Amino acid sequence: MTAGRLPGSGAPLMGRLLPVVAIVVAVTVVGAVLASAGPTLGYDARAYLEAARRLLDGRVIYDTSIDQAGAAGLYLYSPPFTLLAVPFALLPAPLDVVAWTAALIVAFSAAVALLPVRREIRWLIVLLAGLSWPFSYAVKLGQVGPILFLCLALGWRWMDQPLRLGAAMAIGTIVKVQPGILFVWAILTRRWAAVGAGLAVLAGAVAIATLVCGVDTWGAWLTILRSISASITTPHNFTPGAVAYQAGLGEGPAGALQVVNTVAVLAIVLWAAVRTSPTVGYLTAATASQLLSPVLWDHYAMLLLLPTAWLLERGRWWAAAIPLSTSIVLIWLPPVVYPVAFWVALLAPIAIGARPGRRLRAQRPEPDPVLSSET
């Protein structure tokens, strides 16, 4: 079977039907989730928009009285990200949330269209997203997952275009701090121009945010990050340590397990950066950026569509089980499915693409064969 081609003798017919099925499923499922959301529609988006409105009103952006992750109105994002929400905050309710939700759908659609994989794989990703509970949940909440997915997809596509790659890494880091680990990958693969471009974008964003929001805003941001209660005991947290705690393991041992998880993930990222292909190293870092988070919400799993696309492109059709394990039809599965899915997505590209005995520190970046063949 040729990698990236739909299996079976009916592949041409499947290829023609796939876009229709993918669109119908995605629109139906996501539409149903949004229609039934009620007051939870835009739950996270409202926190972003209110922070932007506080900025517009000259008030303090961060509410340091909240100390529970996931609490209503909690805003943990960086000052530069607040500026991105300002245009939406200028709109009246409920148009602000509607516009934000539409922007998330557009961002995800653009990301899928730009994935450096073949057309049928892109439509498979749309289909899997339509079935994905994490994706529907992220859109319902107005969470930043689709924006981050776009940044990561752009970084993958622009891997050999340093300025664009650097900008994509920087914007991803502004959206969520954890993708900053991509800079480690870029350093280890000697993408100095991309690192420089990314740091320049970050420096510019910090300077603008400081001028607009004030120097004290950074202190308030760090204060609220420090004040959030213990992540292991946070409800609905899907890190390995938190899942073990929910299953009955003591807080101390669960915390130790989470430390082991973090150290192991970091070690794998470093190893993948220097011992596998640039693409595998990048996707490993992208997946790890979420698995390293002290609080792993279920909607973060929508980002696993990225390594899934890479695996499907190479004919590993079993990879569809990664997002399907957290699909809306299997929502009854136990919480442990989330850390397992993340770890499979982290290790599978390495297992498929590892090149033993070859160090990429001395290797020039390789062009993606899919991009090279596309017009």
Say what each PLM segment does.
Residues 143-152, 172-178, 241-253, 322-341:
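Contiguous hydrophobic segments
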Residues 174-177, 204-208, 318-319:
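Membrane-embedded alpha-helical segments of transport systems
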Residues 2-165, 189-313, 358-375:
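Primarily membrane-embedded glycan-assembly and transfer machineries that use lipid-linked glycans
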Residues 312-375:
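Aromatic-enriched
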